[in-house]
Amino acid sequence: MSEPQPRGAERDLYRDTWVRYLGYANEVGEAFRSLVPAAVVWLSYGVASSYVLADAIDKGKKAGEVPSPEAGRSARVTVAVVDTFVWQALASVAIPGFTINRVCAASLYVLGTATRWPLAVRKWTTTALGLLTIPIIIHPIDRSVDFLLDSSLRKLYPTVGKPSSS
């Protein structure tokens, strides 16, 4: 999850608790793709996408509760929702889902050509490799998405209330 919060700081339900793991549901679904029906994988994407949407709505709500002139409130809420949604969609769903999918597909292919293991063993090995890859890819993807957004979308935001990449 994230670094420990300073004393008195508000805990973010979507980033500092077990709820954060719902954002990784699709990676788990991708890891199990060779073993479960496609509907289960799509369901895992539904769970992760619901997490992304809930976090974006929560950040917009919190941005709207900050006391300030009404004129800047709408822009601040919009920036909070868009920034959170885009960041989470890329860092929690799209990029890791694609990465785990390709790792598992490549693993299954290599195991099929390089070994004589039974198909069931190859599928379970592929699933294990996919699951083991998840913790390795999280932080590099998060930092890459921070860099991407800092270099593009976040340059378009108004300077007041600009989200930080940390």
Curated annotation (Swiss-Prot):
Top-level taxon: Eukaryota
Family: Belongs to the MTFP1 family.
Listed GO biological process terms: apoptotic process; mitochondrial fission
Entry membrane topology: Multi-pass membrane protein
Main location class: mitochondrion
Upregulating conditions: Expression is regulated by the phosphatidylinositol (PI) 3-kinase pathway.
Residues recorded as bearing N6-succinyllysine in the entry: K123
Gene Ontology CC terms: mitochondrial inner membrane; mitochondrion
Compartments it resides in: Mitochondrion inner membrane
Protein keywords: Apoptosis, Membrane, Mitochondrion, Mitochondrion inner membrane, Transmembrane, Transmembrane helix
Transmembrane regions: 34-54, 80-100, 129-149
PANTHER family from the UniProt entry: MITOCHONDRIAL FISSION PROCESS PROTEIN 1
Record protein name field: Mitochondrial fission process protein 1
The organism's taxonomic lineage, starting at the top: Eukaryota, Metazoa, Chordata, Craniata, Vertebrata
Annotated Pfam families: MTP18
Alphabetized InterPro entries for the sequence: Mitochondrial_18_kDa_protein
Main function: Involved in the mitochondrial division probably by regulating membrane fission. Loss-of-function induces the release of cytochrome c, which activates the caspase cascade and leads to apoptosis.
UniProt keyword annotation of Electron transport present: no
